[in-house]
Amino acid sequence: MIKLYNFDELRPEEILNRDIRAEKNVEDVVDGIIAEVRARGDEALKEYALKFDGAKIDDLQVTQAEIDEAFANMDPYFLETLREAAANIESFHRQQVHKNFVINEKPGIVLGQKYTPIEKAGVYVPGGTAAYPSTVLMDVIPAKVAGVSEIVMTTPAGKDGRVNPVILAAAATAGVTKIFKTGGAQAVAALAYGTQSIPAVDKIVGPGNIYVATAKRKVFGKVGIDMIAGPSEILVLADGGCNPAWVAADLLSQAEHDKLASPVLVTDSAELAKAVQAELEVQIPQLPRAAIARASVDTNGKIILIVVVEYIVVVKTAGVKVNISAGKVSVAGCLLYTSPSPRD
């Protein structure tokens, strides 16, 4: 069960602290996987798919027939929503495209700057029991807008050896060039060094678990990466007027990503705190990834009670007021203000 705390009784380091201890052998495991993929290529990827995902893979690359089947069986309303989301994302990222320029400072002196897109980008998309079409759209479309000529996507297959059709539909909608059935650290290694089937890319983007993050860190330098993504985290600021079911759902939207995720609620209502605590116990068993959400909530989850909404809660390096002024928050990755929240 998620733990309740009184803000006055907590030290700042206790608010920030979370148990992110990983398996001690992560580094060694990832080193071994990278070495195997470099040495044996596709053969190693197929063995890891069977070992980690229970999937027997004959052909690593997703065929056009598989993509066509995914579209044929997809709900038309979902496809329309997918296309609308893709259009919105593309519209936003077109505003970020850098402009080339030339300056003629003096006769005979010409200065300028030209932006050239990388040739190949690799996009990692998590798989397993969860499907993240949003990850596909938000990682692939910026590359497409930038003019990247080849976008290679990797994602683990299910036990049936097939990629989630939602992911395939999103990938085709976004403009992925090639899709491969491989995940985890082995997929990162394949994108960095190449295999018989998978081309080596110039940059790898996309989130993943601690093995994926560790692999990205280790191949950085051979290939560019977007960032080392830590475990998911969410801070919900809610008063007594909020719906506890919605608050609990928001917390679980991140808790179900990773057992190391940190779902945190800050409220000035003891009644809401208790209600959310109870609601979490109702909702967690209903989740497909209930075991992961349970580990996250029980280990790293917090409900912090404050006396008045003007109290400041220290989160990472930001001073975030419950009556939040978005312009004063410097480190939040994403701010969502509404009820219910659109988070995931």
Region roles according to the model:
Residues 175-262:
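Conserved NAD(P)+-binding/catalytic subdomain of aldehyde/semialdehyde dehydrogenases
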Residues 4-7, 179-183, 303-307:
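Short acidic-hydrophobic, aromatic-tinged amphipathic segments that line or gate anion-handling sites
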Residues 337-344:
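Conserved small/polar residues in nucleotide/adenosyl-binding loops
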Residues 104-169:
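Conserved small-residue-rich beta-alpha loop and adjacent elements
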Residues 52-53, 209-211, 240-242, 255, ...:
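Glycine-rich beta-alpha junction loops
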Residues 263-310, 319, 326, 332, ...:
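NAD(P)-dependent aldehyde/semialdehyde dehydrogenase
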Residues 1-119:
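N-terminal Rossmann-like NAD(P)+-binding subdomain of aldehyde/semialdehyde dehydrogenases
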